[in-house]
Amino acid sequence: MIFIRNILVTLFLFSSLLSAKDANNNPEKVIEDFFYHFNEMDINKINELWDLPITYFVGGEIIVAKSYSEVVNYENLKKEGWSYSKINSKNPIVSQEDFAIYKTNFTRFNNQDIELISTDTNLTLIKRGDYWKLKIAIIPINISTGR
């Protein structure tokens, strides 16, 4: 009887670990992590969230990059008044086993918490192995990337 209990406890713990792994890597978590690392200006962490090449459609411009440092220039963004960005909403448009598109609304703020701009972006994510990665960002307006 103790043997069966030990097996059940082991299976429970193993399944808990698997679901914790999934909870830490799903499209919404990747989007949240992206905004967190964007605000931290951590290019290396941002690069880890993307499936290369990074593809950005911003207004009428298309940016294809090997690193997020080719997409954004933080020094120029700060000169333009940017201090941080905040997600207002993220809603799945398409959600499949290995592909997802999220409509994400976000706002940029200055260092006095005054809104600079709000916009929607469509973020396409793909699953590579066990991990979700950002693939394409489509922002319909000409929002500055600091470039």
Which sequence ranges carry the predicted segments?
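Sec-dependent signal peptide recognition
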Residues: 2-10
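Short, low-complexity N-terminal intrinsically disordered segments enriched in polar/charged residues
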Residues: 11-44, 48
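Hydrophobic pocket/interface hotspot
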Residues: 34, 46-47, 54, 71, ...
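Beta-strand elements of well-folded, non-transmembrane domains
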Residues: 39, 108-110, 127
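A mature extracytoplasmic/lumenal domain signature
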Residues: 50, 60-61, 91, 104-108, ...
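A short gly/proline-enriched turn/hairpin at secondary-structure junctions
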Residues: 55-64, 80
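Surface-exposed, charged secondary-structure patches
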Residues: 71-114
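Short beta-strand edge/turn micro-motifs at domain boundaries
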Residues: 118-147
